[in-house]
Amino acid sequence: MANVIKTVLTYQLDGSNRDFNIPFEYLARKFVVVTLIGVDRKVLTINTDYRFATRTTISLTKAWGPADGYTTIELRRVTSTTDRLVDFTDGSILRAYDLNVAQIQTMHVAEEARDLTTDTIGVNNDGHLDARGRRIVNLANAVDDRDAVPFGQLKTMNQNSWQARNEALQFRNEAETFRNQAEGFKNESSTNATNTKQWRDETKGFRDEAKRFKNTAGQYATSAGNSASAAHQSEVNAENSATASANSAHLAEQQADRAEREADKLENYNGLAGAIDKVDGTNVYWKGNIHANGRLYMTTNGFDCGQYQQFFGGVTNRYSVMEWGDENGWLMYVQRREWTTAIGGNIQLVVNGQIITQGGAMTGQLKLQNGHVLQLESASDKAHYILSKDGNRNNWYIGRGSDNNNDCTFHSYVHGTTLTLKQDYAVVNKHFHVGQAVVATDGNIQGTKWGGKWLDAYLRDSFVAKSKAWTQVWSGSAGGGVSVTVSQDLRFRNIWIKCANNSWNFFRTGPDGIYFIASDGGWLRFQIHSNGLGFKNIADSRSVPNAIMVENE
């Protein structure tokens, strides 16, 4: 059978109701803890924030509600394990009442422990951990394969996977574009190859024709030689003609060689012309890449690549500059301000916009000039902070460490110390030092103002505790069998009963029940009933009660 929680009860706050019922028994009012739940857990103070209207009812001094940031109120019994209501000493008389109170206090502690166990994570019928339909908060990131994984770590993994998918789709689209461009270049290259082959064939024809001219000239030379032999008899007369023919043959041979060289040049030029896309005035547009085995010299100060531009040059106080830009303006530049070997501020990298990194590390110092700031920016529902690490170990962080609040936190992993700046106050989880003064987490204060003591010790040493007051809750006469009504709950209280013999008799009560006292030669047997508001004289001997007083709580 499932355990039913009996020592904790919550009520909804509506901004109008101030009275709430206490459904459980308790030994002392200080064991009842009243807490508002909403923006935080606010523990209320008795007689300041609430009071006991009756034994089973508390009344708030203010009607709390959602407008104040609180939606529910919790009534919880927390019986002290150190503040015992009954303390036994050697030689004392064991009374049933004392034994009952001691036993009830022990039972209450056990019952509260059982309820606390029932209200926390447990084990179901199959032996598995059961969070009972509630969240597990403040869970560290998983490390090993069988660790529990927090939702934030899953979201980060999903975001990284989605980003990788988008980048892969982008690369695929770019590859598709490059493939289409390559297909176009291939078609253009095929056309150029056909044209080049045609020009090569034409050039070869020109070269063959030049060779024919060369052969014809040789034939003319042979014919002239035969004529010279035949005209040997008239050699003197024909010498001038032979010399002229030889000169003509030599000139023809030179012209043929020149024609062959020009044909070779024309073939190379045809290949060069095939690589040119177009010529616009003095601007030449190439179809493919330009390869230079040596350095590439440019007489102007830069070059364009698609929509992007790169500039080189230098002016006064900017000895050398390498700048990247586009049609809308400059994007970034690297410059050496003066010709010197000094680095420092002499070498500058300037970006006209945001710098976005995808990981990695930066070495060296980051220096911000006067008037500049270091700004961390993230989505409104994301955490952002500065984290210091030593190797793989976290040292400290400053910032908003979670994504569900706007608090600024200074946290030291090494010392476990945290300072949190909230909307209108600051919270520290350890002692807070102001000069030589110390403020403890429980509200205690230590300092020279109190003689170097803690404030509670100083007050105990310097002042006498105020005595409790008494209140008369009934007066009259209650003979045997008579039952009367009192104005306050008599259960678990220090009471005084005045009997007919004018003697006051002290008694410590428990729950509703029957009690017995001896009174100055007589005795009284009485009953407390009706949730502590009824008093009945069962029987007496010369001890008729005529007044009852209770010690104020």
From Swiss-Prot:
Q: List the InterPro entries hit by this protein, alphabetically.
A: Gp37_trimer, Phage_T7_Gp17_C, Phage_T7_tail_fibre-like_N
Q: Where is the composition biased (Low complexity)?
A: 234-254
Q: Which residue intervals make up region (Disordered)?
A: 180-204, 224-261
Return the GO cellular component terms, semicolon-separated: virus tail, fiber
Question: Transcription regulation: is it a keyword of this entry?
Answer: no
Q: Where in the cell is it found?
A: Virion
Q: Where is the composition biased (Polar residues)?
A: 187-197
Q: What is its main location?
A: virion
Keyword rRNA-binding listed: no
From its record, what is one biological process in GO terms? adhesion receptor-mediated virion attachment to host cell
Extract one GO molecular function annotation from the record: identical protein binding
Summarizing the function annotation, the protein's role is: Structural component of the short non-contractile tail. The tail comprises six fibers made of gp17 trimers, 2 nm in diameter and 32 nm in length. May attach to host lipopolysaccharides (LPS) to mediate primary attachment to the host cell.
Query: In which family does this protein belong, per the annotation?
Result: Belongs to the Teseptimavirus fiber family.
Can you name this protein?
Tail fiber protein
Q: Which organism is it from?
A: Escherichia phage T7 (Bacteriophage T7)
State the organism's lineage.
Viruses, Duplodnaviria, Heunggongvirae, Uroviricota, Caudoviricetes
